[in-house]
């Protein structure tokens, strides 16, 4: 009887342990599956519609994406830098070995790391997209040689200093305080940029402009866009609005588009990743 009782207790104990183990595994799986589903949902969610409760999760996602791109292009840079075999110098170096190439000499291929100028509309309708673009770019510091950032609504200021000394998340409130919450004036902002910072652009610079191109019926100053276009390696305009809205109401997008190498609808973090990948690709052709 005593043995039977102990066996029964042992059976119950094992059963309870197994039940708890299964419950723990199920909870873990459900939590991981839930997290993965949430991430997949956020990748496709309009940046302006991200729930504030998901902000930290979004920052993690953006940093992870940027790290993956940085790793990919840092490797490609190493691989490409070696260039091709310098036959003449290799033969000359190995004369003492009857021309048998014990020591190979490679032609060095110079690869310029990207120079990027980011010009972001931080007025109400577009501020969320600007935040994530800046977070993405500033997480790519190991593959970008120089990054200068500007923000505007009614006028434009350089924000590189703020973002050098603060994380993007901490810097954004200060930037908005200085230049946000005003009626957008693209013409005035382009004038501020060309008067004070045109020297930040040369033939190796990609200019990334983020904005909806809605200028409250003020002069769009497309003449200044032409100047920027002619100086840069490329001008890429990211617009959170769908293309069907470009050129409607006070949108000057179709006029600006004429002075962009690329103009694309960009409203999700997945769009951002694809476009930034395309930019990096132009510098690191394998």
Model-identified regions with their sequence ranges:
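Acidic/polar low-complexity segments with low predicted structural confidence
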Residues: 1-113
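DG-centered beta-turn motif at the end of beta-strands
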Residues: 91, 119-123, 205-216, 261
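Structural beta-sheet core signal
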Residues: 118, 149-151, 207-209, 237
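Conserved alpha-helical "signature site"
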Residues: 218-221
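Von Willebrand factor
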Residues: 157-159, 169-205, 242, 248
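Von Willebrand factor type A / integrin I
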Residues: 226-286
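Metal-dependent catalytic core segments for phosphate chemistry
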Residues: 68, 106, 128-185
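MIDAS-like acidic motif and immediate structural context at the N-terminus
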Residues: 91, 106-134
């Amino acid at each position: 009887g005593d043995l039977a009782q102990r066996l029964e207790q042992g059976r119950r104990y094992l059963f309870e342990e197994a039940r708890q183990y299964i419950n723990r595994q199920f909870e873990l799986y459900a939590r991981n599956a839930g997290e993965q589903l949430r991430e997949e949902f956020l990748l496709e969610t309009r940046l302006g519609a991200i729930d504030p409760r998901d902000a930290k999760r979004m920052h993690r996602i953006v940093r992870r994406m940027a790290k993956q791109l940085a790793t990919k292009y840092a490797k490609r840079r190493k691989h490409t830098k070696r260039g091709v075999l310098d036959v003449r110098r290799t033969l000359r170096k190995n004369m003492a070995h009857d021309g048998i190439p014990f020591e190979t000499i490679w032609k060095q291929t110079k690869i310029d790391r990207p120079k990027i100028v980011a010009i972001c509309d931080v007025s109400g309708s577009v501020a969320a997209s600007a935040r994530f673009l800046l977070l993405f770019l500033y997480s790519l510091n190991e593959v970008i040689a120089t990054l200068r950032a500007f923000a505007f609504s009614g006028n434009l200021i350089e924000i590189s200093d703020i973002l050098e000394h603060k994380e993007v998340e901490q810097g954004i409130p200060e930037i908005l305080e200085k230049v946000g919450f005003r009626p957008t004036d693209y013409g005035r902002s382009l004038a501020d940029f060309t008067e004070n910072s045109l020297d930040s652009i040369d033939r190796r610079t990609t200019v990334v402009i983020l904005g909806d191109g809605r200028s409250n019926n003020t002069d769009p100053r497309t003449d200044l866009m032409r100047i920027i276009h002619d100086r840069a390696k490329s001008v890429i305009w990211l617009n959170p609005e769908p293309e069907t809205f470009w050129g409607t109401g006070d949108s000057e997008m179709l006029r600006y588009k004429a002075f962009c190498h690329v103009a694309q609808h960009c409203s999700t973090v997945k769009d951002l990743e694809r476009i930034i990948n395309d930019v990096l690709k132009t510098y690191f052709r394998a």
